[in-house]
């Protein structure tokens, strides 16, 4: 690999990745973390299949006599679309849930329709007022932090909980795969309800009315009182994203949207323009590193791909400015300003850390995601520490 940077010997995470360390073999701590998760969950092995088979039986038992027995968040992307197919194959009765931040691409919207129609699955949608959604997004942009997708990610989680509560469903299935996508490094892309609300209060102009904000109390309600479990099937079973794409295209005339997270136009702006240009950060190394770890791509090819400019949708910047009512000068001024960290705004982070023992128990019981426990419930390393 042609670089003077220190790079993990197993993936392509380099010394610029937040809070990275390397062991005596040159393997980064994130590879070791994923190694531990694979062993714990039995991912793609008999152990994982047995564990997940028991979960399926528990889902069916808990859903007996109800219209639905599980919730699946859908975006029109590969993972959630394939998850819909799998749940029907497993004999489950899913309710698809979609949070519409009003930035969906036409391809994603059509993908959702095609798959749900073919599989005869009902859809529950929460649409935030587009002016309000744009006001929240614009406020995060003005805050100079990297998490402009935070409001969408948190809202989807809240909406899935609400749908589960409404229909008395005890299980939410999520299409995340740490084998195919990796896990976002510590300190990157943090979000919680207090963070979003505080930034919107500082920079927003409209009241937050239709946006489904997940506060700390609501988070505890969903996990401890409602006891809604979050299951990530791909953490247990074998999953190949490329095979899933081929299957979806063949069976449902599903269309690929051009890249990971590019099914939504605000997400596309975040990944291909905002992070690379303002923060000098490119999250493609998450997926590329996962491909290298899985032997689906060699390190040199992945490194070359990572160092190419990301694909940028034509007229995406102009669309972003028009939607958020930003002048050229205003947009340029924000993009050139010094970036800020989420640590400079109010969050629930200290509270999560204080309650770490509780969240460990909840994570083990699938009542909060294990990735939440690993990323949010430990103190950040001090300055100068890795």
Indicate residue ranges for each PLM-predicted region.
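Nucleotide-activated chemistry modules centered on ATP-dependent adenylation/adenylyltransferase
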Residues: 1-70, 86-386
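Short, glycine-rich nucleotide/cofactor-binding loops
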Residues: 70-79
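Hydrophobic positions on the alpha1 helix immediately C-terminal to the Walker A/P-loop
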Residues: 82-83
């Amino acid at each position: 690999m042609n670089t003077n940077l220190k790079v993990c010997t197993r993936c392509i995470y380099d010394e610029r990745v937040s809070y990275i360390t390397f062991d005596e073999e040159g393997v980064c701590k994130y590879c070791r973390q994923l190694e531990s998760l694979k062993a714990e969950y039995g991912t793609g092995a008999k152990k994982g299949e047995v564990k997940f088979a028991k979960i399926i039986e528990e889902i069916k038992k808990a859903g007996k006599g109800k219209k639905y027995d599980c919730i699946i968040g859908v975006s029109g992307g590969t993972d959630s679309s394939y998850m819909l197919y799998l749940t029907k194959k497993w004999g489950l009765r899913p309710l698809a849930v979609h949070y519409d931040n009003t930035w969906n691409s036409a391809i994603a919207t059509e993908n959702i329709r095609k798959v749900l129609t073919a599989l005869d699955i009902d859809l529950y949608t929460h649409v935030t007022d587009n002016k309000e959604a744009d006001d929240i997004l614009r406020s995060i942009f003005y805050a100079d932090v990297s998490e402009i997708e935070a409001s969408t990610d948190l809202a989807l989680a809240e909406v899935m909980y609400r749908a589960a509560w409404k229909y008395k469903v005890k299980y939410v299935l999520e299409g995340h795969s740490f084998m195919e996508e990796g896990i976002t490094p510590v300190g990157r892309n943090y979000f919680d309800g207090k963070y979003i609300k505080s930034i919107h209060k500082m920079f927003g102009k409209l009241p937050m009315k239709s946006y489904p904000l997940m506060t700390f109390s609501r988070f505890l309600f969903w996990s401890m009182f409602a006891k809604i479990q979050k299951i990530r099937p791909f953490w247990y079973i074998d999953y190949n994203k490329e095979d899933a794409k081929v299957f979806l295209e063949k069976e449902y005339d599903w269309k690929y949207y051009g890249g990971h997270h590019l099914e939504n136009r605000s997400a596309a702006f975040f990944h291909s323009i905002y992070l690379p240009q303002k923060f000098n950060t490119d999250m493609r190394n998450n997926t590329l590193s996962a491909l290298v770890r899985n032997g689906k791509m060699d390190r040199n090819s992945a490194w070359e791909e990572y160092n190419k400019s990301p694909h940028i949708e034509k007229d995406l910047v102009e669309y972003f400015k028009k939607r958020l009512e930003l002048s050229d000068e205003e947009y340029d001024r924000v993009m050139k300003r010094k970036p800020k960290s989420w640590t400079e705004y109010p969050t629930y982070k200290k509270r999560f850390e204080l309650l770490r023992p509780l969240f460990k128990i909840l994570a083990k019981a699938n009542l909060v995601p294990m990735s939440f426990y690993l990323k949010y419930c430990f103190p950040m390393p001090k300055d100068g520490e890795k």
